[in-house]
């Protein structure tokens, strides 16, 4: 009798953390570009001529992000003024980052609650 050999190949996504790290790295090194017409085709070139041309692997953008610190209804940005922040956090919810250098006021609140504790 004959025997069969089966070979199965499939592609799998790398771990989510790895994908996130690669995207963050690309985001941090992204280049602002503009369209230029070369003959009958449009090409993307760095807006700042001192930057090297991008590759197919690079992340590029045409428009800068709005300033999320300031209120701008035209762009749907509510701003960060008046929001609650976390004084001890260094992340995006932290006061240093969220308040955009405007400074911030701190309030210390003590909450007294009744509980059904039994000793």
From Swiss-Prot:
Known glycosylation sites: 86
InterPro entries: Wnt (IPR005817), Wnt_C (IPR043158)
Post-translational events: Palmitoleoylation is required for efficient binding to frizzled receptors. Depalmitoleoylation leads to Wnt signaling pathway inhibition.
Primary location recorded for the protein, binned into one broad class: secreted
Gene Ontology cellular-component terms listed: extracellular space
Disulfide bonding pattern of the chain: 69-100, 85-95
GO molecular function terms noted in the UniProt entry: cytokine activity; frizzled binding
Pfam families tied to this protein: wnt (PF00110)
Alphabetically ordered keywords of this record: Developmental protein, Disulfide bond, Extracellular matrix, Glycoprotein, Lipoprotein, Secreted, Wnt signaling pathway
Transmembrane segments: none
Function: Ligand for members of the frizzled family of seven transmembrane receptors. Plays an important role in embryonic development.
Similarity annotation: Belongs to the Wnt family.
Full protein name: Protein Wnt-4
Organism this protein belongs to: Sceloporus occidentalis
Gene from which this protein is expressed: WNT-4
């Amino acid at each position: 009798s004959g025997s069969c050999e089966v070979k199965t190949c499939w592609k799998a996504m790398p771990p989510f953390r790895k994908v996130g790290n690669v995207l963050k790295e690309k985001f941090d090194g992204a280049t602002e570009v503009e369209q230029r017409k070369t003959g009958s085709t449009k090409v993307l070139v760095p807006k700042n001529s001192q930057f090297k041309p991008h590759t197919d692997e690079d992340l590029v953008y045409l428009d800068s992000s709005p300033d999320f610190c300031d209120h701008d209804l035209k762009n749907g940005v509510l701003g960060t003024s008046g929001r609650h922040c976390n004084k001890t956090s260094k992340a995006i919810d932290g006061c240093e980052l969220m308040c955009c250098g405007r400074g911030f006021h701190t309030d210390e609140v003590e909450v007294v609650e009744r509980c059904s504790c039994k000793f």
